[in-house]
Amino acid sequence: MELLKEAIRKRGSVLSSGVLKVDQFLNHQVDTNLMSAIGEEFARLFADEHVTKVVTIESSGIAPSFMCAHSLQVPLIFARKKKSVTMDKENVYSSRVYSFTKKEYSEVTVSKDWLCPGDRVLIIDDFLANGQAATGLTQIVEEAGATVAGIGIVIEKSFQDGRALLEGKGYRIESLARISSLEGNKVQFVEESAHFAYNKS
């Protein structure tokens, strides 16, 4: 998605060979016009999957997920990292997930009231790195007896093993921007890497 790639190039900051900072438009300050376009693109990509619910993890996944759910005209559910006092702890689906950015585990939960066996669920997240967050959400969806209709990722770090992990389990993945490298404080996209390799040969 060129609009997203342009935002990454102009407004993203490479902090290390493994960390891209995008808090100017995605996970702190939110560019609502860009999120709207991202939501519409996910809705277009998964239009044939008969999605009934969109699921994400709080909090950075909420903005793109909301726009996607709005475009699909279906409810959005966000898994909580901390149990609410209003949530019956005996009436939840839960999974333990590891955050690549925060270097810590979280127990994420979804109320059993909102996921049903007949649901076809689209999982949306802001980043795909090692695939642990998305895997945790697939476990919750499947524990509910629902079906994972697909996984939509805003920014994928293709140099990490998240895609291989999820595709190995048979899930459909659509990423709007795939980054092949952050080496040298420069963002390199998968398509650009392939083009460079072709030209070199």
Swiss-Prot record:
<protein>
    <recommendedName>
        <fullName>Xanthine phosphoribosyltransferase</fullName>
        <ecNumber>2.4.2.22</ecNumber>
    </recommendedName>
</protein>
<dbReference type="GO" id="GO:0046110">
    <property type="term" value="P:xanthine metabolic process"/>
</dbReference>
<dbReference type="InterPro" id="IPR050118">
    <property type="entry name" value="Pur/Pyrimidine_PRTase"/>
</dbReference>
<dbReference type="InterPro" id="IPR029057">
    <property type="entry name" value="PRTase-like"/>
</dbReference>
<keyword id="KW-0963">Cytoplasm</keyword>
<dbReference type="InterPro" id="IPR010079">
    <property type="entry name" value="Xanthine_PRibTrfase"/>
</dbReference>
<keyword id="KW-0660">Purine salvage</keyword>
<comment type="similarity">
    <text>Belongs to the purine/pyrimidine phosphoribosyltransferase family. Xpt subfamily.</text>
</comment>
<dbReference type="GO" id="GO:0032265">
    <property type="term" value="P:XMP salvage"/>
</dbReference>
<dbReference type="Pfam" id="PF00156">
    <property type="entry name" value="Pribosyltran"/>
</dbReference>
<keyword id="KW-0808">Transferase</keyword>
<feature type="binding site">
    <location>
        <position position="157"/>
    </location>
    <ligand>
        <name>xanthine</name>
    </ligand>
</feature>
<feature type="binding site">
    <location>
        <position position="20"/>
    </location>
    <ligand>
        <name>xanthine</name>
    </ligand>
</feature>
<dbReference type="InterPro" id="IPR000836">
    <property type="entry name" value="PRibTrfase_dom"/>
</dbReference>
<keyword id="KW-0328">Glycosyltransferase</keyword>
<feature type="binding site">
    <location>
        <position position="27"/>
    </location>
    <ligand>
        <name>xanthine</name>
    </ligand>
</feature>
<comment type="subunit">
    <text>Homodimer.</text>
</comment>
<comment type="function">
    <text>Converts the preformed base xanthine, a product of nucleic acid breakdown, to xanthosine 5'-monophosphate (XMP), so it can be reused for RNA or DNA synthesis.</text>
</comment>
<comment type="pathway">
    <text>Purine metabolism; XMP biosynthesis via salvage pathway; XMP from xanthine: step 1/1.</text>
</comment>
<dbReference type="GO" id="GO:0000310">
    <property type="term" value="F:xanthine phosphoribosyltransferase activity"/>
</dbReference>
<dbReference type="GO" id="GO:0006166">
    <property type="term" value="P:purine ribonucleoside salvage"/>
</dbReference>
<feature type="binding site">
    <location>
        <begin position="129"/>
        <end position="133"/>
    </location>
    <ligand>
        <name>5-phospho-alpha-D-ribose 1-diphosphate</name>
    </ligand>
</feature>
<dbReference type="GO" id="GO:0005737">
    <property type="term" value="C:cytoplasm"/>
</dbReference>
